[in-house]
């Protein structure tokens, strides 16, 4: 059984590799990210340089902040305003927002006097796409939302001629989803829908390689993870948001979205034995907020399941109970069983490596694709 002796990742991560120290490759990536994104004085110096570049922008808005109503994105928006930035808040509505999340978004933008752009995804197409991914029997049923959000942020940035997108991800609190648990690309989206869907995707904002080249390489639009440069505490952030923005906690990790709540608490653990708390708790272990033993004890507690959320998801997706049961009983598969861009990415790894070295490709993208390239070479 493969199990990392440092974090909490184990044999449920198909690509897990253990080095001579007993650590996995994701721990090694964490260490590299700590070097690239220091906190304290060095982190502040790096952030000040980025902040100056953002403020030098001549656009009406000097940055975009993607907002979901959760703690990380709302805190990022608050800090952007406090640092003197003029952000445009962007929300991608996939039809699964909780009332608490919607209220949090509206209150934050109102109190901070930030303009909000909300793009509503075509529900009929999106529902059909989500059903397609459930029918594909892969653990990637939540990636249509990730793709839609990413595409939306870049397209809004292009429309308003904005070069910087701030997001609320921090590797110290969120770590990094293993590829075997979460893989996405535009070709994957197209082919899963073609194989399992009932509708053509005419309005869905897919994010293809050509879109990546257009926005990231040609237009040089950058995604900035502000929280990587600061000593970020979710609990302290929540207290600040409650006090300053009358923010309400949606509940669990990413439970501001009802589908993600269903997906992480029921679908993944029940069908695949995947517990995404391992990622979050691994971040807590590696950053020293808890001990590894505390993390292990936390995982012994069964992921709380709200059957009302499960029933709501099945009903909203318009799945019969028989079809849902069939989906849950189908043999698990992965992105490797379907047509994706993975082979292409592994073939052009030299280009990705070059673009990373000159500061165009993001750290997390680079490291994830490096692991992917090794997976694809091994597959051959």
Where are these regions (language model features)?
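Nucleotide-activated chemistry modules centered on ATP-dependent adenylation/adenylyltransferase
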Residues: 1-63, 79-348, 353-380
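Hydrophobic positions on the alpha1 helix immediately C-terminal to the Walker A/P-loop
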Residues: 75-76
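Short, glycine-rich nucleotide/cofactor-binding loops
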Residues: 63-72
């Amino acid at each position: 059984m493969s199990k990392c002796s440092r974090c909490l990742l184990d044999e449920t991560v198909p690509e897990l590799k253990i080095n001579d120290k007993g650590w996995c490759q994701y721990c090694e990536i964490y260490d590299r990210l700590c070097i690239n994104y220091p906190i304290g004085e060095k982190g502040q110096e790096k952030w000040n340089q980025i902040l100056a570049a953002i403020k030098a922008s001549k656009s009406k808005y000097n940055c975009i902040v993607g907002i979901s109503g959760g703690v990380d994105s709302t805190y990022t928006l608050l800090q952007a305003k406090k640092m003197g930035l003029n952000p445009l808040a962007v929300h991608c509505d996939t039809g699964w927002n909780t009332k608490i999340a919607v209220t949090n978004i509206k209150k934050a933008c109102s109190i901070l006097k930030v303009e909000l752009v909300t793009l509503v995804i075509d529900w009929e197409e999106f529902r059909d796409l989500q059903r397609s991914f459930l029918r594909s029997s892969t653990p990637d049923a939540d990636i249509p939302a990730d793709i839609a959000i990413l595409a939306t942020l870049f397209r809004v940035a292009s429309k308003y001629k904005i070069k910087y997108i701030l997001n609320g991800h921090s590797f110290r609190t969120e770590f990094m989803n293993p590829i075997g648990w979460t893989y996405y690309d535009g070709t994957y989206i197209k082919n899963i829908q073609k194989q399992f869907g009932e509708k053509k995707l005419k309005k869905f904002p897919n994010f293809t390689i050509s879109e990546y080249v257009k926005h990231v390489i040609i237009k040089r639009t950058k995604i900035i993870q502000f929280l990587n440069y600061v000593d970020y505490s979710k609990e302290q952030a929540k207290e600040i948001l409650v006090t300053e923005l009358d923010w309400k906690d949606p509940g669990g990790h990413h439970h501001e979205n009802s589908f993600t709540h269903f997906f992480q608490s029921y679908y993944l653990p029940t069908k695949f034995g995947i517990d995404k708390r391992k990622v979050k708790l691994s971040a807590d272990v590696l950053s020293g907020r808890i001990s590894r033993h505390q993390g292990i004890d936390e995982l012994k507690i069964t992921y709380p399941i709200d059957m009302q959320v499960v029933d709501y998801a099945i009903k909203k997706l318009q799945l019969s109970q028989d079809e849902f049961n069939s989906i849950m009983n189908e043999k698990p598969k992965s992105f490797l069983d379907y047509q994706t861009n993975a082979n292409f990415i592994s073939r052009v790894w030299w280009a990705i490596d070059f673009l990373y070295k000159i500061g165009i490709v993001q750290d997390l993208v680079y490291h994830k694709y490096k692991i992917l390239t090794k997976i694809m070479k091994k597959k051959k």
